[in-house]
């Protein structure tokens, strides 16, 4: 399925859940093949952009750019996720698949084949395209591909509305390029975030929309992030397309989750680790003060600690770590650290238990182990390790 392989994997994962063969499934795609050979192969097709930009559905679109990525989704049956208090980002209501069949060339898409996959997704979902507010398209930025994709979408969507465009269309490839085997997963993750954050995401690098969108009865190109206003009579709905190089087509129907808010998991450890990084001590003070003045409920304390790990930069010049039992303990230790910075004793006076800080640039570690991935050895491998 090539570029549609991650949504092909998703279809198999959904079958596993529906059949009861699995209770939790991880599905997605991985691509890290942007070596010179990959570019040489793609350069033999009209797919690559000579200007080095991917501009889906734009008048000046001239091709795609290759990207790399990993996209993995955790899937469960809704009843199981609600029972276990899992955080639910969105619902998958349907998925449709199919093939273009015979065409003029292996990389030439057929709108009719894509339309079949789209229609199958909505039949499975149990609702029509007129209730969909956002389509995260395959949108490679190639003239032929974008034109064919919009033609396929119009075959399904046109005549379902009141004649005025109601559905936003876009592509994450304008931001990250074409991640090939991971492309479908990237598009799906973007659409899921759009639903959970109630925001219509932008497609960037658009000067003037393509001609096929100017007179569209169904679609408009969203070029800036804005609140997602939806009808009160139904939840927000989005769809995702992913089309393969050889004609494999997949379309996923997503829906906003409107059920009860997931219960935060209980704290496992008596203390939590908070980590901070900045380029200057003033920057560190600003970060610490922000945390001191943030009211954190007991059930959210672990989540706040985890969020600091996501923004921590290990190679920053100024780094600090605090181990705290609760918000009061965290505020006291952060205040002690701020006090030392402001009095000029930072780095010389003892900080006390549970507080660690450094202004020394981190050193590059030595090689300790070597994992070849194949179990193979080479001459002098042990000597290389000994000298490292």
What residue ranges belong to the model's regions?
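Condensing-enzyme catalytic core of the thiolase-fold
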Residues: 1-268, 286
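Flexible catalytic loop/linker elements that gate and position reactive groups at enzyme active sites
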Residues: 109-124, 213, 233-367, 378-384
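Short amphipathic alpha-helix adjacent to the substrate-entry channel of hydrolases
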Residues: 386-388
């Amino acid at each position: 399925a090539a570029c549609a392989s991650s949504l092909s994997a998703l279809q198999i994962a959904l079958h596993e859940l529906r059949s009861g063969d699995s209770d939790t499934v991880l599905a997605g795609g991985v691509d890290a093949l942007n070596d010179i050979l990959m570019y040489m192969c793609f350069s033999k097709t009209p797919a690559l952009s000579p200007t080095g930009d991917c501009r889906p559905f734009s008048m000046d679109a001239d091709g795609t750019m290759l990207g790399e990525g990993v996209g993995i989704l955790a899937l469960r049956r809704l009843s199981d996720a609600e029972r276990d208090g899992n955080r639910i980002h969105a619902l998958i209501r349907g998925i449709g698949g199919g093939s273009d069949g015979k065409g003029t060339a292996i990389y030439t898409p057929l709108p009719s084949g894509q339309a079949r996959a789209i229609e199958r997704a909505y039949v499975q979902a149990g609702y029509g395209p007129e209730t969909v507010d956002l389509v995260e398209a395959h949108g490679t930025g190639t003239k032929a591909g974008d034109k064919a994709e919009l033609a396929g979408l119009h075959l399904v969507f046109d005549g379902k509305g009141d004649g005025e465009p109601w559905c936003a269309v876009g592509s994450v490839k304008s931001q990250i390029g074409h991640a090939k085997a991971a492309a479908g997963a990237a598009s799906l993750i973007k659409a899921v975030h759009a639903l959970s954050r109630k925001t219509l995401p932008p497609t960037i690098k658009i000067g003037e929309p393509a001609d096929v969108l100017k007179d569209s009865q169904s679609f408009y190109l969203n070029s800036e992030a804005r609140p997602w206003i939806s009808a009160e009579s139904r939840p927000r709905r989005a769809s995702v397309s992913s089309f393969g190089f050889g004609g494999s087509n997949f379309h996923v129907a997503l829906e906003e989750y409107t059920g009860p808010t997931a219960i935060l998991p209980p704290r496992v450890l008596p203390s939590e680790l908070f980590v901070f990084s900045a380029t200057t001590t003033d920057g560190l003070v600003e970060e610490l003060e922000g945390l001191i003045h943030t009211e954190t409920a007991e059930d959210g304390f672990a989540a706040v600690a985890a969020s600091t790990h996501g923004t921590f930069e290990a190679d920053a010049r100024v780094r600090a770590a605090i181990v705290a039992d609760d918000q009061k303990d965290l505020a006291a230790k952060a205040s002690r650290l701020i006090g030392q910075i402001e009095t000029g004793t930072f780095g010389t006076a003892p900080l006390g238990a549970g507080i660690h800080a450094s202004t020394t640039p981190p050193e590059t570690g030595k090689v300790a182990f070597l994992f070849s991935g194949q179990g193979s050895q080479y001459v002098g491998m042990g000597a290389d390790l000994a000298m490292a």
